[in-house]
């Protein structure tokens, strides 16, 4: 197979995503004609990479923020070019004002035209701050979490000021439990858990089916290459999928605060204690810059040496 041109950017990104070696990453990209996702699977089939990292690639600065008001809450992300701006009080105040309006606005288009205390729209206020701060600022996304009865838990990781930081999480618990203090404490703990464990879905039914099929295919082909018989492989795949669920499905994950129990078991215990049904209806996790791509300016000499040959 003739080698295609593989850029240093892609090799570096694949290494960061999989933990595989530089040469292995380059070979995987060549073998898959530069297809990034296929290269990940190629490495995993060869046993050269760990499971795909659950967190998205962080590629932007700024702040995420949450606001909880009774049974309704909002989370937003506002991006800046540098972390220095994220520590700027004027920028922090801007983000606070925007998240306070987000609950009322309900969607990002309405939020952008919502009026701030200055009388200007959010969009206009952002433009004014760009001129003052000297960096490009973007209201990237927002989401709403609302429940009819129960508790909303919120958590912000790496807070720079209260409710603003690098990772923001909201968790909604629907319940008729009378002890709201204990219910709110549970919601808070689950929010912290979500921040640290980054689940992809609440339960197995809501998990993207393509992720499950991809995991099955990768593990099946890896086991087949190792020469294992099909009837053994099938049982191993079943076990691997159970493990996969324990890694990415919230209810199947071991609870951060009680590792011997799953989140589902913790909720069941809480239901018995509070004499009421408890259901996680939704969770939202915003990690700053998640999924945003940007060009790298400098690379290690080893990257250049490997990819320019």
UniProtKB/Swiss-Prot annotation:
Gene3D superfamilies (alphabetical) = 1.10.286.20, DNA helicase RuvA subunit, C-terminal domain, Elongation factor Ts, dimerisation domain
Q: Which UniProt keywords apply?
A: Cytoplasm, Elongation factor, Protein biosynthesis
Cellular component GO terms, alphabetical:
cytoplasm
**What are the subcellular locations of this protein?**
Cytoplasm
What is the recorded function of this protein according to its Swiss-Prot or TrEMBL entry? Associates with the EF-Tu.GDP complex and induces the exchange of GDP to GTP. It remains bound to the aminoacyl-tRNA.EF-Tu.GTP complex up to the GTP hydrolysis stage on the ribosome.
**Membership in a protein family:** Belongs to the EF-Ts family.
Concerning HAMAP family, the annotation shows: EF_Ts
Protein name, per record: Elongation factor Ts
Q: Which organism is it from?
A: Rickettsia prowazekii (strain Madrid E)
């Amino acid at each position: 197979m003739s080698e295609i041109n593989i850029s240093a950017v892609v090799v570096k990104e694949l290494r960061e995503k999989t933990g595989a070696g530089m040469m292995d990453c380059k070979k995987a990209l060549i073998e898959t004609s530069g297809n990034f996702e296929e290269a990940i699977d190629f490495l995993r089939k060869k046993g050269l990479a760990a499971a795909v990292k659950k967190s998205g690639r962080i590629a932007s600065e700024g702040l995420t923020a949450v606001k909880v008001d009774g049974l309704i809450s909002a989370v937003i992300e506002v991006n800046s070019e540098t972390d220095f701006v994220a520590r700027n009080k004027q920028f922090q105040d801007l983000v606070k004002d925007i998240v306070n309006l987000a609950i009322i606005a309900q969607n990002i288009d309405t939020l952008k035209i919502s009026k701030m205390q200055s009388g200007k729209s959010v969009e206009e206020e952002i433009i004014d701050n760009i001129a003052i701060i000297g960096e490009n600022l973007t209201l990237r996304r927002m989401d709403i979490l609302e429940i009819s009865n129960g508790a909303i838990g919120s958590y912000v990781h790496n807070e720079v000021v209260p409710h603003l930081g690098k990772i923001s999480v909201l968790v909604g618990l629907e319940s008729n439990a009378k002890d709201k203090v204990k219910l709110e404490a549970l919601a808070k703990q689950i929010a912290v858990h979500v921040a640290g464990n980054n689940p992809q879905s609440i339960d197995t039914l809501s998990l993207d089916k393509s992720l499950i099929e991809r995991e099955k295919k990768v593990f099946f082909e890896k086991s087949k290459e190792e020469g294992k018989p099909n009837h053994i492989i099938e049982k191993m795949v079943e076990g691997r999928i159970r493990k996969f669920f324990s890694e990415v499905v919230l209810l199947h994950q071991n609870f951060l605060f009680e590792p011997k129990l799953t989140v589902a078991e913790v909720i069941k215990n809480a239901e018995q204690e509070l004499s009421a049904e408890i259901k996680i209806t939704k969770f939202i996790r915003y990690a700053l810059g998640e999924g945003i791509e940007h060009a790298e300016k400098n690379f290690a000499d080893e990257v250049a040496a490997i990819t320019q040959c």
